[in-house]
Amino acid sequence: MTKFNGKFSEDIVKEVRKDFERRREERKPLELQWRLNMNFYNGNQYSEITPVGDVEQYGKQYYWQEREVYNHIASIVETRLSKLNRLKCGISVRPFSNDDSDVQTAKLSTQIVKALCEENDLPKLLNEASSWSEVTGSCFFKTVWAGEKGRVIGSSKKGAVREGDVDISVVPPYEIFPDNLGTSNLDDCMSIIHAKAYHVDEIKDIWGVEVQGEDVNVFSLDSASVGMGYNSVPDTLNGVAHDMCVVIEKYSRPTGEKPNGELSIVAGDKLLYHGDLPYINAVNEGRGYPFTKIICLEKLGCFYGTSIIERLIPLQRAYNAIKNRKHEFINRLSTGVLSIEDGSVDTDNLEDEGLSPGKVLIYRQGSTPPKLLESGRIPVDFQYEEERIMSEFTTISGVSELSKYSNVLNQMSGKAIGLLVEQDDTRLSIATTSLRMGIKRVCEQMLRLYKQFCITKRMKRFSGDNGEVELAYFTASDLQSDDLVFDNENELTDTLENKRNMVVELVRMGIFNDDKGAISNRNKLKILEILGLGNWESSKDVDESHRKKAMKENIDFGKEEVKVAEYDDHDLHIDEHLKRLLEEKNQSLIELIDEHIKEHKMMKTVDMAAQIPNERGESQNGNAIIPTN
């Protein structure tokens, strides 16, 4: 724990808490909309935002009113999420140049990124973040260096000492407070506050400070009030946790006065940390925010995004109303409305039991017999309005009946169905682009954190081709490039089925054929991999092994003596060495590689000369070769 001057500490705590309260009050209207969105998604659809600044549930106008919920919002959001979940974490590091060392460094960085994505279970985090983003409009990732992760490298009085590793977490929009709600770009904010409720024991374990706990609303992050109003909505956003304390982390971006930025961490009335931004995670080795923002839809002039649910709430209310009025009309048709003369029957009995089948109805002699009023039929306008609202659901949400129910007409061609599916996917382009850019930024921050903290040699276990395990030792100096590119353009449009069809067409056209009109073994393996059938026995493939050996020799040129082996595949080695030769600028290395290539060509000539008589069925001395039994 860092010791701070008493007066200095009190001033910092007071300033941070005052700034936090101001930002929370400014953001309250947006937070109410998020709560309303969550209620409609969960089925609490008879709620509204009141003028007093709360979300409350309004009651029935009459006791007999139908108040059922026909939740189309949930199915629309779930359909969008199922499509967003098809996005993969396929990303690669682009080398600085075509130099073999840069290429190998980029490959190592790519393997590290993939390993970190697997260790942090990034696909699961993406699904969780997408759920928050679709309902509230925004979500955030936080990428930090966790000292309690990684392999054990020693021990101390407090326990095992670990080497540390990257940690990625999903941060709901309730926990992020920008200094200006009108700034749309996260990096343009002068400061960002991340406020989260921690248990007091967890605060003591992390920062070594004891703070006083209280009951805290984990979403609004204020002290929980006792009791709820009569019309309060029983939603999950009013969850109250006990023995908690709100930890406020205020990140200030670098300025001319403070080139390394500033971070202040406050819990209760205690200052836990005050100093420079801890992570070199920005471009050009600068310090920046450890956050990444993703959105559902862009909201102009606002830091947070907007959710598709906000557009669907009026339609959902209208749909619930039309369905309930329709069922009320059906109830009148089925049970009827009885007309009786005053005092002719026992009305109490009728109200209690109704007109049950076989009921003996006794009425006063001489009075008009009870009769059912004519209710007519259900107005056709009800049906028209219901169909119109359903079509508006499709228009506004961008999710068609094809995506939700597969209700495809028989006369539609496969091409037409494909166009409809492509149109549905196109309407998700804003969310998919934001998610892809979020993945890229998270991976960039992971690499930059490794470059900052991997000072000594570290070992990483990778999943190689065909699932085999590969081990690599590296340091920060081995991770030069953080220029990331996606392996696929877009998984929603560039699907596996589209790839397979394209590859099959290219094979038919002979694009993969060599000069002899056949497909090489290497191309066969690549084709099988693209088709999703796996890179069959690639780790055991002889050609691939020769190619890897030649690439390793390219790196070893100039460092150690590289000899030509009799078992080398000379054609493959010559091709790989020629690539290095054409890219090399050092004259001494050019001469060294040239001599090495000449040795391969010489041994290749000798091998070919030895094979010619064998192909004719003759021995070296000209005599016929007679096979023995």
PLM features: what roles do these ranges have?
Residues 1-629:
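Extended alpha-helical, oligomerization-prone segments that build pores/tubes and scaffolds
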